[in-house]
Amino acid sequence: MPIKAILTDIEGTTSAVSFVFDVLFPFARAHLPDFVRQHAEQPQVAAQLQAVRTQSAEPDADVERVIAILLEWIAEDRKATPLKALQGMVWEQGYNAGQLKGHVYPDAVDALQHWHQQGYRLFVYSSGSIQAQQLIFGCSEAGDLSGLFSGYFDTTSGPKREAQSYQTIANATGFAAEEILFLSDIVEELDAAKAAGMLTCGLARDGGVLAGHRHVNSFTLIDPASF
C-alpha cells in the first residue's frame, strides 16, 4: 500500500532539541512571572491558574504562590497541562513580537515543501502542545510553513510510546495506518508507530543506530515512495 501521508515528530527530527531546551524553555521561564501578573484576570489565563491550584492541592494560593509553583514545575521538568498552556501563551507573545523564531532544519524545510508539492498529506505529532507546534512552523526562521500541514497532534491523542496513540491519529487523519510514514528520532516512538501498522523512518542526525527501523541523518535521504 503506497504512502499517502507523513507524520513527523519535531524535537530532534524537524528541529534541534537544543532549540526547545536552550531557547524556548528559558524564554518561558524568564517571561512567565510577569506574564501571569499582567494577565491573571484574563479568562484563559485565570482558568490555568485555577488548574494549578487544583493540581497542587493549594486552592487558596494567591498569584505569587501560583507563580512559585509554576517555577518549581519548570525546574522539575513536570509535564503539567496548565504549565504547558501558559508556556504556550508566553511563546505566542514572543513569536508575535518577533523575539522568537522557530528552528526547522533546512533539509526538513526543503523535504516538507517537496512532499507537499508531490501531494503527500503532512501531519505533526509532538509532546509539545498543538499551539506550540503551530508557532514553531508558523513563525519559523524559514518563514510561515504552517500551510504545509493538514493537522497537528499532541499528547491529547495519547502517549507517544503507545501504539494506540498512533491508531487514534491514523483514524483522525482518515488514512489507514499502513498509508502513513512516521518520522522520529526516538526508537520507542518508532516501535509504537510500527506496532500500530505505520511505516517508520528514524532520524539519527548525530549518527548512531535506531534498531529495527530504517534510519537516515537528513530529510533529503527520505523517499516516501521507497517504503
From Swiss-Prot:
Record's cofactor remark: Binds 1 Mg(2+) ion per subunit.
InterPro entries (UniProt xref): Enolase-ppase_E1, HAD-like_sf, HAD-SF_hydro_IA, HAD_sf
Protein's GO biological process: L-methionine salvage from methylthioadenosine
Name assigned to this protein: Enolase-phosphatase E1
Family annotation (Pfam families): Hydrolase (PF00702)
Stored HAMAP family: Salvage_MtnC
Protein task: Bifunctional enzyme that catalyzes the enolization of 2,3-diketo-5-methylthiopentyl-1-phosphate (DK-MTP-1-P) into the intermediate 2-hydroxy-3-keto-5-methylthiopentenyl-1-phosphate (HK-MTPenyl-1-P), which is then dephosphorylated to form the acireductone 1,2-dihydroxy-3-keto-5-methylthiopentene (DHK-MTPene).
Coiled-coil blocks: none
Pathway participation: Amino-acid biosynthesis; L-methionine biosynthesis via salvage pathway; L-methionine from S-methyl-5-thio-alpha-D-ribose 1-phosphate: step 3/6; Amino-acid biosynthesis; L-methionine biosynthesis via salvage pathway; L-methionine from S-methyl-5-thio-alpha-D-ribose 1-phosphate: step 4/6
Subunit structure: Monomer.
UniProt keywords, alphabetically: Amino-acid biosynthesis, Hydrolase, Magnesium, Metal-binding, Methionine biosynthesis
Stretch forming the signal peptide: none
Cofactor(s) annotated in UniProt: Mg(2+)
Enzyme class: hydrolase
Gene3D superfamilies on file: 1.10.720.60, HAD superfamily/HAD-like (3.40.50.1000)
EC number of this enzyme: 3.1.3.77
A single MF term (Gene Ontology): magnesium ion binding
Similarity remark: Belongs to the HAD-like hydrolase superfamily. MasA/MtnC family.
